Amino acid sequence: HIPAVAVGTDYTCIPFWEETNLDYYVIPHEDLIPEYVKRGVSEEKLLPYGIPVRQDFCRNLSKEAARKKLHLPMDVPMFLVMSGSMGFGKLAVFAAELALRCRNGEHIVIICGNNAKIERILRKEFHFNKRVHIIGYTNHVSLFMDACDVIYTKPGGLTSTESLVKNIPIVHTAPIPGCETANLQFFAARHLSVSSKHLAKQVQLGKALIENDSLREQMSEAQRRERKPEAAMQIVSLLERLVSHE
């Protein structure tokens, strides 16, 4: 018998998992157990360890230290916009709207990922705006999260979990229907993020978070209650135990 473990990376029962017969299923949260059981996965096999993230997301650098490393200005509010590896829809329009509404000295960091086309468009659009920082592909996402005050991201399971573990206030943009919809609903129901499908409202929600310390702290407190930074280590320990028993 070769041990087999599945790791869920969305906050819902992964489609077709009930048709598998593995040793264990690592799921993002204990509140999802009833959904998995209803779909036919045995409760004894469900381990709510959380979604694993790289260890650098489990360590927090001070805002000042992170900004110094990234050569970002110190004493200004700062938004982080994650495009996703392929870019979330209408990013150029969103960035223009956010920049237009940032009238109190806020800075915006936009990480374009692998989307070279959107990176070119944004660099051209904001060439003369020194408060908008366009970043292409980077291995320093954790550092940028440390440096910024609020993050905009689509509700993918991994980036949402990285943001949750990092304890940075989240504004979720419109989901791709399916698992991302479930992720958004899970986060919103527990006050781990705010969201809107409307671009102008997304901007407004981020502005409210960055301007209101109390709102930001309420979300941060909810995130501290729900995050599971030890997920990766627990999964590794589980795999080591399973292999050693073979």
Regions found by a protein language model. Name each.
Residues 188-214:
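C-terminal "capping" alpha-helix adjacent to the active site of nucleotide-linked donor transferases
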Residues 23-85, 114-117:
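A nucleotide-sugar donor-handling region in carbohydrate enzymes
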Residues 228-246:
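C-terminal alpha-helical cap of glycosyltransferases
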Residues 146-156:
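Acidic donor-binding loop of glycosyltransferase active sites
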Residues 142, 160-166, 185:
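Short alpha-helical segment that forms part of, or immediately flanks, the ligand-binding pocket
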Residues 148-149, 167-169:
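A short alpha->beta transition loop at the rim of the catalytic pocket in nucleotide-sugar-dependent
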Residues 63-65, 72-148, 181:
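Donor-nucleotide binding loops and adjacent catalytic segments primarily
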Residues 215-229:
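A short, well-ordered alpha-helix in the C-terminal region of glycosyltransferases
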